[in-house]
């Protein structure tokens, strides 16, 4: 199976600050330093040795890094299947706008699906990302990162899949800054299967380890298999 990904990435001023604070307060989730910052603003800055390496204070939007993924699947039994994946990512984004890395990356991973019942599955994957000559904070960037995810999938109706999963990946940067360290997230959402070649994913990701990833991510993906 061949799959292509062409992301569109936008960094914009906040517009959900108040609802996000209310959501965390209602569920008793940690607010961290969120309430002490101005609302509905964007500031992404990084300085090292008195040199400013990243300084984004306005909205940015562009095509991200395009990637191609190739998979081979083996059915172990009528309940279990394992697939092996390889991916190459090309630097089509703009690293100065943080919509790309400026480097060509390779990733290898394996994935497993286990059927619990006709409409319920456990799934997981684990792999390794290899990157060289990354132009985003190149002096502290690591050449590899490991990633693992596991979750459960439920299909209440034929074209609809609901999912909940945990995701973790090791740090891509060699630094003591918390935001650039290992990441742990909880993601929930669903998939609408249009046909055998097309499907749409909608997901929301919440940071489990506060301060290492954005408070919340909204993801919309359209997959086309060839």
Language-model features, listed with the residues they occupy:
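Transmembrane beta-barrel domains of Gram-negative outer membranes and organellar outer membranes
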Residues: 1-132, 139-226
């Amino acid at each position: 199976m061949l799959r292509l990904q062409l992301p569109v990435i936008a960094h914009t001023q906040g517009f959900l600050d108040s609802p996000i604070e209310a959501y965390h307060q209602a569920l008793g989730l940690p607010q961290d330093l969120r309430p002490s910052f101005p609302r509905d603003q964007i500031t992404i800055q990084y300085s090292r040795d008195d040199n400013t390496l990243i300084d984004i204070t306005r909205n940015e939007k562009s095509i991200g890094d395009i990637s191609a993924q190739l998979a081979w699947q083996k059915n172990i039994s009528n309940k279990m299947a394992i697939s092996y994946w390889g991916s190459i990512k090309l630097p089509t984004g703009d690293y100065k706008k943080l919509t790309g890395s400026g480097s060509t990356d390779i990733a290898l991973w394996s994935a497993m699906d286990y059927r619990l019942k006709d409409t319920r599955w456990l799934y997981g994957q684990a792999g390794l990302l290899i990157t060289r000559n990354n132009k985003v904070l190149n002096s502290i960037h690591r050449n590899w990162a490991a990633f693992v995810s596991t979750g459960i999938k439920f299909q209440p109706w034929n074209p609809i899949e609901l999912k909940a999963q945990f995701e973790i990946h090791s740090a891509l940067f060699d630094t003591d800054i918390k935001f650039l360290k290992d990441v742990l997230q909880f993601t929930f959402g669903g998939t609408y299967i249009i046909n055998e070649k097309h499907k749409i994913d909608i997901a929301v990701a919440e940071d489990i380890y506060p301060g290492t990833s954005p408070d919340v991510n909204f993801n919309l993906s359209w997959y086309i298999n060839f």
